[in-house]
Every structure is written in C-alpha cells, then in structure tokens.
From Swiss-Prot:
This is Alpha-1-antiproteinase. Residues 1-24 form the signal peptide. Belongs to the serpin family. Interacts with CELA2A. Interacts with ERGIC3 and LMAN1/ERGIC53. Interacts with PRSS1/Trypsin. The lineage of its organism: Eukaryota, Metazoa, Chordata, Craniata, Vertebrata. One of its GO terms (cellular component) is extracellular space.
Length: 416
C-alpha cells in the first residue's frame, strides 16, 4: 500500500515559508528562556554568526554558478532561521541534513546553543529602533483539522517568536490571501504576492520574513543624481539614475579581489558593503570572496577621498530553495523519505515547496528620511572616480549580531 505523504509549505520572504521540526527533547521540553542581559544575548547570537556567514557564501556561490546574467539578492538570515525552525520538528537523517546543510557541526556547537543563538538573533533584530526599520517575523499557518505536537508549537513560539494561525487550506484562494497579507504587512508592503499557487492538501505553512529600511548616515543629494551608462556586459549597456557624492569614504582597493571595497553606514547598526570588481574580474571576486575577507573589511576603517557614483535601483528576486539547498546537502526534507514526525504524529509530512523572496531598494536617502547636506574637507589632490557602472556585489551586515542580513549581486539595475 502506497504511503500517503502530506504536504508542508515553506515560504521565505527575505521571507521564507517552510515546515519545522521538534527539538524539544534536546531542549528538555522547554524553550530557552528570554533574558534581559544584552551581553549574554550578543554572545549567544555571535556563536552562530560565522556559520551564518559561511552559509551565506555557500548559497551565493550556488546562485552565481546557476547564472552569471541575473541579479542575485537573498537573506541568509531569513533562510537559515526558517530551516533551523524546521529542524525543531525533524528527526533522524532529515534533522541531521538540515543542521549540517546550514553549516552547523553538533560536535562543536550543541543544538540547544544553535537555537538559543537564533532566538537571541531574532530578539536583537526586532528591538525597537527609531533610527532604522528592521523587523523579522515567523508565522505558522496550521490547517484547521491538523493536530501539531505541543512541544513543537511551544518551541517555535518561544525560540523563534513565531505566531500561530488556524487556516482552512481547502479554501486555497482564501488561505493564499491570508498568507500573502501577513507577509505584505510584515515587510511594510515591500514583498507582495509571495504565494502564487497554494496546494489545498497543504497541512501547514511556515512563513519567515525580514524587512529593512535604513537611512544613510551621509545621504546623497538628489540634485546630483544624473542618468549614466551601466555596462551589464560587453554587449549590453543600460541607462540608470546614478547617485553622486564627492567626499570621504570608507573605501579601499583590494588587490586580492581586484576590486574596490566601499562601506556605507546606515544610521544605527547596519553597514552596506559594496564590492566593485575591475573589468573582467567578477569571476575572480566571486571565487575568492569569503567570510574571513568580509570580516577584515568590516573591522578595518579606511578614510579615502573619492568621487563616488552609485546607481539608484529597486530589484527583487524569488527562489525555489529546493534546488538551492540541495547543493548544500538539504534534500531529504523535500522527499517522501522526510521524517518530520516532531511536527505531527498523525501523518507523514514533507516540505512540498520552499520559496524565498527578497527585495532591495537603494536611493539617495536610503528611506523616506529627509535629505541632509554634508560638508566635508577632502585633500586638494584630485580624488579618484569610483563608479559602480558594471556588475557589483552588495552585502548588508548587522554589526550588533555580526550577521549578514542580505547578500546580492547587481548585474542589471533595470531588472525589477
């Protein structure tokens, strides 16, 4: 007799919707308690930060090898936290694959410490800050007739700050609307229509989103934005609005990467790292860039004068994570061999779909903030022109948690 496999849905929106596991046993049936000790929280999330960075580069390399003509933009924090939450309900090899694929070695870091790290990471990112808007959220949509394991529900709520909603997946259109409305609201309207089609046999959907809006510490002036050429490749050139500012920047040239490295701070704790390779050196940059180099860029401060040109852009990318995560060894959870018995005992589960959508907007202000004028003293010698007028990399990094929030490559700024 054929085994009946019920579907779980995983959606990520710089954002992710997924199916979770039960690690309640490892955590002794109780979620890690919240703490007001900021230094303790930082220490917990710092333990998983190197793993998140390595995971980010693993995903980036997979996407880059798939296509060198497309924009790339994703949130490693969103994807990793969603699948770590899924691991709370996974058993056996399914459980092992997920944590190993995320870059964790349980002989080096106990599983309870991994989940505590994510708990404190999400808690820290969600701290109110009037200077920037950085929010993350997890929503668990459960079919009205489904009975989920209590310890799983407890752990996803306490560890991953997940909200739980009862929903009728048989009414696929209404269920789709509720999930999309939840994501759109949580992402401040930046991520819409994440779910295009919803299988009525779905038992649960786990949605994770992360949304960021930041103000540049030193905004660009709109009057200096002009239309200029952006060279997509040797045959293709497009016109883009190019922001411009003459001043002092955290900017240096990296011989190893044959690239300019620019760090622009947002008001608050987020830094944008832009990496512009020399002509014909994009492959060299992608092959050699790693967590260790990124850490060095973020640690050392440079002060260089430059005439900077940076394109205004608004891009979004959507990924089916089944193939992406297969490249890092996470496969069983999508197959009929999946063991997600920590989520429900009633029937076998597998993740039928894992979607991730991320959106990026770069403009003069960074957000709706009122622009300001900055006056800076620069050397009398003519500063170099550094113009991001060809494909470049972009990494948004949270200094509090030492985590890469978003990673991307801009190949064509006009591709929405």
């Amino acid at each position: 007799m054929a085994l009946s496999i019920t579907r779980g849905l995983l959606l990520l929106a710089a954002l992710c919707c997924l199916a979770p596991i039960s690690l309640a046993g490892v955590l002794q049936g109780h979620a890690v308690q919240e703490t007001d000790d900021t230094s303790h929280q930082e220490a917990a999330c710092h333990k998983i930060a190197p793993n998140l960075a390595n995971f980010a580069f693993s995903i980036y390399h997979h996407l880059a090898h798939q296509s060198n003509t497309s924009n790339i933009f994703f949130s490693p924090v969103s994807i990793a936290s969603a699948f770590a939450m899924l691991s709370l309900g996974a058993k056996g090899n399914t459980h092992t694959e997920i944590l190993k694929g995320l870059g964790f070695n349980l002989t080096e870091l106990a599983e309870a410490e991994i989940h505590k790290g994510f708990q404190h990471l999400l808690h820290t990112l969600n701290q109110p800050n009037h200077q920037l808007q950085l929010t993350t959220g997890n929503g668990l949509f459960i079919n009205e007739s489904a009975k989920l394991v209590d310890t799983f529900l407890e752990d996803v709520k306490n560890l991953y700050h997940s909200e739980a909603f009862s929903i009728n997946f048989r009414d696929a259109e209404e269920a789709k609307k509720k999930i999309n409305d939840y994501v759109e609201k949580g992402s401040h309207g930046k991520i819409v229509e994440l779910v295009k089609v919803l299988d009525p046999n779905t038992v649960f959907a786990l949605v994770n989103y992360i949304s960021f809006k930041g103000k540049w510490e030193k905004p660009f002036e709109m009057k200096h934005t002009t239309e200029r050429d952006f060279h997509v490749d040797e045959q293709t050139t497009v016109k883009v609005p190019m922001m411009n500012r003459l001043g002092m920047f955290d900017l240096h040239y990296c011989d190893k990467l044959a690239s300019w490295v620019l760090l622009l701070d947002y008001v608050g704790n987020v830094t944008a790292c832009f990496i512009l390779p020399d002509l014909g050196k994009l492959q060299q940059l992608e092959d050699k860039l790693n967590n260790e180099l990124l850490a060095k860029f973020l640690e050392k401060k440079y002060a260089s004068s430059a005439n900077l040109h940076l394109p205004k852009l608004s891009i979004s990318e959507t990924y089916d994570l089944k193939s992406v995560l297969g490249d890092v060894g996470i496969t069983e959870v999508f197959s009929d061999r999946a063991d997600l018995s920590g989520i429900t005992k009633e029937q076998p589960l597998k993740v039928s779909k894992a979607l991730h959508k991320a959106a990026l907007t770069i403009d003069e202000k960074g957000t709706e903030a009122v622009g300001s004028t900055f006056l800076e003293a620069i050397p009398m010698s003519l500063p170099p022109d550094v113009e991001f007028n060809r494909p470049f990399l972009c990494i948004l990094y949270d200094r509090n948690t030492k985590s890469p929030l978003f990673v991307g490559k801009v190949v064509n700024p006009t591709q929405a």
